[in-house]
Amino acid sequence: MAAESGKVDPMKQFSIEPMLGSEGWEIAGYNIAFTNSAAWMALTTVLLAVFVWGGMKGQLVPGRWQMMVESFTSFIDDMLEVNIGKAGRKYVPYVFSLFMFILFGNLLGLLPLGVLGIHPFTFTSHFTITGVLAIISFSIVLIVGFWKHGFHFFSLFVPSGTPLPMIPIIFPIELISFLVRPFSLALRLFVAMMAGHVLLKVLSSFVIDGINAGAGFGLLVGAPSFILMIGISALEILVAGIQAYVFALLTSLYINDAENLH
């Protein structure tokens, strides 16, 4: 952001920039420098580990920290039991970690640290990151499906009661819709987070332009934009939680297909 010139590039915030090892850190021609994206993912992982560790005291009368961790765990446990059944409990560690990792990453990217010279990076606004998370979930679905049901897993793509002549038509349609799942799962989170951050950055450019243009233009454009920024920021906090929940929810539904073939 360049306040002096009043220019704000809304896409600049998504740039992946090397922090360590920008030169000579290559494997098979690919640069493996430690980037801002990796740094914020590492920070998210550390904070998540501290959050969980702090809530594992197992006190008979739990403190606020322990209650918070147990509340999130119970929330995920209940969701999996509703969507999968008793068999869903064994997936609590994964889905809980997935949900919290996305939630922490979304929220960290909203922190107003720019005033301190620190520029938060929302790694969930990159399709490569959300894509990897979706592929991991999809891989678990495939492993569970074939491990538990073998080739009978393919019966998932033929709904019960389908007339025999319709199977050659229904099967490829169901298979394609199944294979598209990781793409749609990743795209949903990526678009939601990216759109919100772009909107906030555009509004911030209006505020800066209003300040630089003088009091009159500032009151006419800058002040309403600033108020709108506050409202959008509050909405983005809500979206951060909703998108983490949706990702975890859809993952649980996909695992249910692998576990129960429906």
Swiss-Prot record:
<comment type="similarity">
    <text>Belongs to the ATPase A chain family.</text>
</comment>
<keyword id="KW-0138">CF(0)</keyword>
<keyword id="KW-0066">ATP synthesis</keyword>
<feature type="transmembrane region" description="Helical">
    <location>
        <begin position="98"/>
        <end position="118"/>
    </location>
</feature>
<feature type="transmembrane region" description="Helical">
    <location>
        <begin position="189"/>
        <end position="209"/>
    </location>
</feature>
<feature type="transmembrane region" description="Helical">
    <location>
        <begin position="219"/>
        <end position="239"/>
    </location>
</feature>
<dbReference type="InterPro" id="IPR035908">
    <property type="entry name" value="F0_ATP_A_sf"/>
</dbReference>
<feature type="transmembrane region" description="Helical">
    <location>
        <begin position="32"/>
        <end position="52"/>
    </location>
</feature>
<comment type="function">
    <text>Key component of the proton channel; it plays a direct role in the translocation of protons across the membrane.</text>
</comment>
<feature type="transmembrane region" description="Helical">
    <location>
        <begin position="127"/>
        <end position="147"/>
    </location>
</feature>
<comment type="subunit">
    <text>F-type ATPases have 2 components, CF(1) - the catalytic core - and CF(0) - the membrane proton channel. CF(1) has five subunits: alpha(3), beta(3), gamma(1), delta(1), epsilon(1). CF(0) has four main subunits: a, b, b' and c.</text>
</comment>
<protein>
    <recommendedName>
        <fullName>ATP synthase subunit a</fullName>
    </recommendedName>
</protein>
<dbReference type="InterPro" id="IPR000568">
    <property type="entry name" value="ATP_synth_F0_asu"/>
</dbReference>
<keyword id="KW-0472">Membrane</keyword>
<dbReference type="Pfam" id="PF00119">
    <property type="entry name" value="ATP-synt_A"/>
</dbReference>
<keyword id="KW-0997">Cell inner membrane</keyword>
<dbReference type="GO" id="GO:0046933">
    <property type="term" value="F:proton-transporting ATP synthase activity, rotational mechanism"/>
</dbReference>
<keyword id="KW-0813">Transport</keyword>
<dbReference type="GO" id="GO:0005886">
    <property type="term" value="C:plasma membrane"/>
</dbReference>
<keyword id="KW-1133">Transmembrane helix</keyword>
<dbReference type="GO" id="GO:0045259">
    <property type="term" value="C:proton-transporting ATP synthase complex"/>
</dbReference>
<keyword id="KW-0406">Ion transport</keyword>
<keyword id="KW-1003">Cell membrane</keyword>
<keyword id="KW-0812">Transmembrane</keyword>
<keyword id="KW-0375">Hydrogen ion transport</keyword>
<feature type="transmembrane region" description="Helical">
    <location>
        <begin position="153"/>
        <end position="173"/>
    </location>
</feature>
<dbReference type="InterPro" id="IPR045083">
    <property type="entry name" value="ATP_synth_F0_asu_bact/mt"/>
</dbReference>
